[in-house]
Amino acid sequence: MRKTYWLMALFAVLVLGGCQMASRSDPTPTLAEAFWPKEAPVYGLDDPEAIPGRYIVVFKKGKGQSLLQGGITTLQARLAPQGVVVTQAYTGALQGFAAEMAPQALEAFRQSPDVEFIEADKVVRAWATQSPAPWGLDRIDQRDLPLSNSYTYTATGRGVNVYVIDTGIRTTHREFGGRARVGYDALGGNGQDCNGHGTHVAGTIGGVTYGVAKAVNLYAVRVLDCNGSGSTSGVIAGVDWVTRNHRRPAVANMSLGGGVSTALDNAVKNSIAAGVVYAVAAGNDNANACNYSPARVAEALTVGATTSSDARASFSNYGSCVDLFAPGASIPSAWYTSDTATQTLNGTSMATPHVAGVAALYLEQNPSATPASVASAILNGATTGRLSGIGSGSPNRLLYSLLSSGSGSTAPCTSCSYYTGSLSGPGDYNFQPNGTYYYSPAGTHRAWLRGPAGTDFDLYLWRWDGSRWLTVGSSTGPTSEESLSYSGTAGYYLWRIYAYSGSGMYEFWLQRP
């Protein structure tokens, strides 16, 4: 009886809660508490890449521990009587789990006061395409064309640990010289690469011939299968493992992505807050990167791809969520078919490991640098104004590898509105901008929140549906800084800033469509 009590209680909440919903026919928004969100939102149900019947359940901070104690085996035993099949359990980057469940169980979790949100599990793919030398390294160590036919470096990344969240790595390949090993396999295999994508990415990061940082330690975190595809829940499992098991200084490379996923975004944010630098691919759809995850995570370094003529590659995503560009067309590197095999590929997948490699170079010389400091150094050191056809909203920044040892800081955004406020302690909240909502056309909303050191302030975005507010986005990491990107339809929007712990003044930046 004990093992079924928790979910039975959820169903009781569902039955009783159905009698308490406020109703309002006036389409004009109100800030009255009766019309605030009452149930956990479910994201991604209409996504064409959604996997039917599979969901990711994320608990609120401080909740769900009793259910997660004992790991996936215990969790499965407790939820199996309700027809819930648990596939992943998360205790590092997120507090939650992934499972197959029927609509009745989904609705029960949605009504639980302990659940932050639920998300449809989705297909995730590697961001690369095959194509029939090595110019990428040559380009990043110089400011201008023409290429010098050489790669100059003052560091090798020795002592830095890079986690390749991908299809695995052929760890025996000669490019790696014994520095590659298996960390984790979310698919239950041995971490070896049966696709090639992960080995190619690892070669660009740390191969002796093709690598930016030629002495790094490489760890395979396999989340994609032999076809180069996987699920959001599996990718989160890889991020969760990195968060719990990384050794500093640490960098993670994610040359993969898919549609918008709040769960994946929050997992990456929390992993960065735990001290891991993340380089993520912008995507290969020639579209706005703000519509992809984890590309839209502001704390990560989101990378677009360029050609050898310093033009944005025709396939590369673009926009304000891109932080910088790096070589990503016709990039040769190691391949999985033998210990000496090579292959030439195109993609933002190929651009991203150049950035991960430069992060490793910087961390060798600055091993205690925070992810924010590493990102600032890379962005401040980038070559500017050289690229063509970068796409609307994109920064004209090209990766540069010969960084100075100092770090700097960058503003979170340009051409955005700035607000301040104060929270008195846990449970206090403010609405922004300036205590009210705003009407917006369709497009991307982006916001950044900075609270005092040692606090934990969280960020929520609500949208008015004509009768009540719905939560459409949230950023609830464990630190004083949050960021959120959401692409939505025209309508009324409202930002809620909430103090989970601590008090004091905060800064808030808002970029509207």
Swiss-Prot record:
EC top class named in words: hydrolase
GO biological process: proteolysis
Keyword rRNA processing belongs to the record: no
Propeptide: 15-127, 409-513
Xref: SUPFAM superfamilies: Protease propeptides/inhibitors (SSF54897), Subtilisin-like (SSF52743)
Activity over temperature: Optimum temperature is 80 degrees Celsius for caseinolytic activity.
Cellular-component GO terms for this entry: extracellular space
Keywords: Autocatalytic cleavage, Disulfide bond, Hydrolase, Protease, Secreted, Serine protease, Signal, Zymogen
GO molecular function: serine-type endopeptidase activity
Domain of life, per lineage: Bacteria
Catalyses which reaction(s): Exhibits low specificity toward esters of amino acids with small hydrophobic or aromatic residues at the P1 position
EC number, UniProt record: 3.4.21.111
Domain Inhibitor I9: from-to ranges: 54-125
Record PTM: The N- and C-terminal Pro-sequences are successively removed through the proteolytic activity of PstI itself. The C-terminal Pro-sequence is required for translocation of the proteases across the outer membrane.
Active-site residues from the entry: 166 (charge relay system), 197 (charge relay system), 349 (charge relay system)
Compartments, as annotated in UniProt: Secreted
Domain Peptidase S8: 134-409
Disulfide-bond pairs as recorded: 194-226, 290-321
Family named by the database record: Belongs to the peptidase S8 family.
Function: Aqualysin I is a thermophilic alkaline serine protease.
Protein name: Aqualysin-1
Organism field: Thermus aquaticus
Organism classification: Bacteria, Thermotogati, Deinococcota, Deinococci, Thermales
